[in-house]
C-alpha cells in the first residue's frame, strides 16, 4: 500500500484549525472564577505595625503559598462584638493588601455577602479576633477575673461568628482561627528592665490566661463550626518554662519565651502589641501548614 503524503497546503490547514481551537480553551480558562481566600479580624489580620500602618502581614504570605486570591475584610481595633455589630470600620488602615471597605454594613455581614456570592469558589477563611477583648485586663488590679469575664463574651461571639461563616461558605471550606503571641511576657523588659515584682507576676498570669482561658475558648468556638485554631501563643514559646534564660544583646539575660516575644513583636521595644514581620510570617506558616493538613486528608 502506498503511503499518502499530505500536501503543504493541507498541513497549513490543519495547523490553522489547531490555532483557532486553542484560543477558545484559553478564553474559557481566562474567565474561570478564581478561588478566594477570605480574611476577617482585627489589626493582626491587616498586618499592622507601628509607624508603618498596614503591611503584608500574614495574609499575603498565606495567599502566596496557597495560590488563593486574597480578599481582606479585617479592621483595626475590632473586637468579637464589633465584628458582628459595628457598621463600617472606624479604623480603616490605608494600603491594606486586597482590603475591602463596607461603610454601610458590619464586617461579618460584608464577608457573608461575599461568601454567598462566590459560594463554590472559596478556598479558605481565616479569622484573628479576640485580642482587643482582653487587652484592657493587663491594667486591672485582678487580671484573671477580668479575662474570665471577657472570655465568656469571646466564646459566645466567636461561636456565632464561626457559625455564620460556615453557613455562608458551605460545609467543606476550611475555617482557621489564629491566636496571638503573648506580648505581656515582654513586660519583663518594657518599660523597665529589670522589671518590678508585680510586672513579673503579670507576665506569669498572662501565660495562664492564654493557655487555660482565652485559647481554649477560641478553639472550642471554631471547632463548633467545623473549623480549627492555630495556637500562635504556643508556637512562639509562651508555654515553656520561664526559668530557662538566654543572653541577648539588647536586654541582657532574660527568659527564653520573653526573648521570643521580643524578636517577634514590638512590645519589648515600643510597648506595642503588634507583630514584627517575622512574627506575621510565623503566623502565616502556621496557617498554611494547617490549611494543607486539612485539605489533603
Regions found by a protein language model. Name each.
Residues 92-150, 182:
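Oxyanion-hole/transition-state-stabilizing segment in secreted/luminal serine hydrolases
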Residues 29-86, 125:
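Serine-esterase "nucleophile elbow" of acetyl-processing enzymes
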Residues 1-29:
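Secretory targeting and sorting signals
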Residues 254-297:
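Histidine-centered active-site loop/cap adjacent to the catalytic His
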Residues 24-35, 60-64, 104-125, 159-171, ...:
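Short amphipathic alpha-helices and their capping/turn segments at secondary-structure boundaries
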Residues 85-103, 191-195, 242-269:
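Surface-exposed intrinsically disordered loops and tails
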Residues 36-41, 45-47, 69-74, 123-128, ...:
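Structural recognition of the beta-strand scaffold that forms the well-ordered cores
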Residues 153-155, 185-234:
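Substrate-gating cap/lid alpha-helix
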Amino acid at each position: 500500500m502506498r503511503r499518502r503524503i499530505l500536501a503543504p497546503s493541507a498541513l497549513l490547514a490543519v495547523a490553522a484549525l489547531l490555532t483557532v481551537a486553542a484560543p477558545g480553551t484559553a478564553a474559557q480558562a481566562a474567565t474561570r472564577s478564581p478561588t478566594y481566600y477570605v480574611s476577617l479580624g482585627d489589626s493582626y489580620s491587616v498586618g499592622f505595625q507601628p509607624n508603618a500602618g498596614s503591611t503584608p502581614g500574614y495574609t499575603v504570605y498565606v495567599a502566596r503559598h496557597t495560590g488563593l486570591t486574597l480578599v481582606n475584610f479585617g479592621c483595626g481595633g475590632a473586637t468579637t462584638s464589633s465584628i458582628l455589630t459595628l457598621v463600617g470600620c472606624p479604623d480603616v488602615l490605608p494600603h491594606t493588601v486586597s482590603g475591602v471597605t463596607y461603610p454601610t454594613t458590619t464586617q461579618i455581614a460584608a464577608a457573608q455577602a461575599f461568601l454567598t456570592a462566590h459560594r463554590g469558589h472559596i478556598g479558605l477563611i481565616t479569622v484573628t479576633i479576640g485580642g482587643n477583648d482582653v487587652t484592657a485586663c493587663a491594667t486591672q488590679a485582678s487580671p484573671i477575673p477580668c479575662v474570665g469575664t471577657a472570655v465568656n463574651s469571646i466564646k459566645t461571639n466567636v461561636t456565632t461568628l464561626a457559625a455564620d461563616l460556615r453557613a455562608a461558605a458551605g460545609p467543606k471550606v476550611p475555617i482557621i482561627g489564629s491566636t496571638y503571641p503573648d506580648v505581656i511576657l515582654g513586660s519583663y523588659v518594657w518599660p523597665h528592665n529589670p522589671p518590678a515584682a508585680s510586672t513579673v507576676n503579670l507576665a506569669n498570669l498572662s501565660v495562664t490566661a492564654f493557655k487555660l482561658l482565652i485559647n481554649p475558648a477560641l478553639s472550642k468556638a471554631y471547632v463548633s463550626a467545623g473549623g480549627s485554631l492555630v495556637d500562635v501563643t504556643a508556637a512562639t514559646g509562651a508555654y515553656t518554662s520561664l526559668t530557662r534564660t538566654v543572653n541577648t544583646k539588647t536586654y541582657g539575660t532574660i527568659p527564653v519565651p520573653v526573648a521570643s516575644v521580643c524578636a517577634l513583636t514590638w512590645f519589648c521595644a515600643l510597648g506595642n502589641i503588634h507583630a514584627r514581620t517575622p512574627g506575621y510570617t510565623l503566623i502565616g506558616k502556621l496557617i498554611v501548614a494547617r490549611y494543607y493538613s486539612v485539605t489533603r486528608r
